């Protein structure tokens, strides 16, 4: 599991930062990539990374401001042009379906793979399978905006091979049956319960990716006990009132959410273009005063998420 930040700027592109897009690489977990937001030029940013459009399985849109969606039609079309055939699902607020349909129709872009668009109308679980589930809550922004909590389900513990070998059980198909939790009878009549030969489960990871938002309770709830919290930091602490007026957060407010939620790690993104060069480091300094394990994303930077 690895983050690749494709765009970390706020509102409009700048020389140093493109607009919002984050790839969550799940190559080991499911051989796929999930994308969060897709601002203009996202597909161009992808060219500089290991992300492959054909591997993008899901796209989660936080809200419908242009700096978060204007790259979506182009990416959907290019995925088809490049031979993508596997299904892709886009999740987002009401209106995302119309945006995609109109953009593809007017440009006569033909997508040759199954494309599903799921409009989120209620908070709660928007996706679940055997490996992950994704929950969402409304944030505090000028238009409807969602944050996403990605939960990896606990992974089954390893088979206690050494314990079986000590008992004289030889490797073979029986090992698989025991790992599947079956009750197995050996040739000598010994009964083995597979559940007694499985180690403790490995706890799954929790990732929280928030859209644009003021400081709010929903952010804390989504980030509770997260291994990684990705939070916007459009403004410095001295501009807290301006952040509030424009429905955004300061770096210090992001750190406060991480602290309250008992998150393990905070990554700041959505940085205003007013912070050019190394001036963005002031945002990092302010956040670390409150939450030490804070990093600030830059375009094309990767962040592994350890188990």
From Swiss-Prot:
Pfam families from the xrefs? Lactamase_B, Lactamase_B_2
Query: Which reaction is catalysed here?
Result: Endonucleolytic cleavage of RNA, removing extra 3' nucleotides from tRNA precursor, generating 3' termini of tRNAs. A 3'-hydroxy group is left at the tRNA terminus and a 5'-phosphoryl group is left at the trailer molecule
Any note on cofactor binding? Binds 2 Zn(2+) ions.
Q: Is Transferase found in the keyword set?
A: no
Give the active-site positions.
Answer: 67 (proton acceptor)
Instruction: Report the EC code(s) recorded for this entry.
Output: 3.1.26.11
Query: So where does Zn(2+) 2 get bound?
Result: 67-68, 212, 270
Q: Which positions in this protein are listed as binding Zn(2+) 1? A: 63, 65, 141, 212
Function of the protein: Zinc phosphodiesterase, which displays some tRNA 3'-processing endonuclease activity. Probably involved in tRNA maturation, by removing a 3'-trailer from precursor tRNA.
Family (UniProt): Belongs to the RNase Z family.
Q: Subunit details for this protein?
A: Homodimer.
Protein name per its UniProtKB record:
Ribonuclease Z
């Amino acid at each position: 599991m690895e983050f690749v930040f494709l765009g970390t700027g706020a509102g409009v592109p700048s020389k140093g930062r493109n607009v919002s897009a984050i790839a969550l690489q799940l190559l080991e977990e499911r051989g796929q990539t999930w994308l969060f937001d897709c601002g203009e030029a996202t597909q161009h940013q992808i060219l500089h990374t290991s992300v492959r459009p054909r591997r993008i399985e899901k796209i989660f849109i936080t809200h419908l401001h242009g700096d978060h969606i204007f790259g979506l039609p182009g990416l959907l079309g290019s995925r088809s042009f490049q031979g993508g055939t596997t299904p892709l699902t886009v999740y987002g607020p009401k209106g995302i379906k119309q945006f995609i349909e109109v953009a593809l129709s007017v440009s006569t872009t033909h997508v040759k793979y199954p494309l599903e668009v799921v409009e989120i109308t209620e908070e709660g679980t928007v996706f679940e399978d055997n490996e992950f589930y994704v929950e969402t809550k409304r944030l505090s922004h000028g238009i409807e905006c969602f944050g996403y909590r990605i939960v990896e389900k606990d992974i089954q513990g390893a088979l206690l091979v050494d314990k079986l070998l000590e008992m004289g059980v030889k490797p073979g198909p029986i090992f698989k049956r025991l790992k599947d939790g079956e009750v197995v009878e050996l040739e000598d009549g010994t009964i083995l319960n597979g559940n007694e030969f499985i180690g403790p489960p490995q706890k799954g990871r929790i990732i929280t990716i928030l859209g644009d938002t003021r400081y709010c309770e929903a952010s804390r709830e989504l980030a509770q006990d997260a291994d990684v919290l990705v939070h916007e930091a459009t403004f410095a602490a001295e501009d807290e009132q301006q952040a509030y007026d424009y429905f955004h957060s300061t770096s210090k407010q992001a750190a406060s959410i991480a602290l309250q939620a008992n998150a393990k790690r905070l990554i700041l993104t959505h940085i205003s273009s007013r912070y050019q060069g190394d001036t963005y480091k002031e945002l990092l300094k302010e956040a670390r005063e409150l939450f030490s394990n804070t990093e600030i994303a830059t375009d094309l930077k990767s962040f592994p998420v350890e188990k």
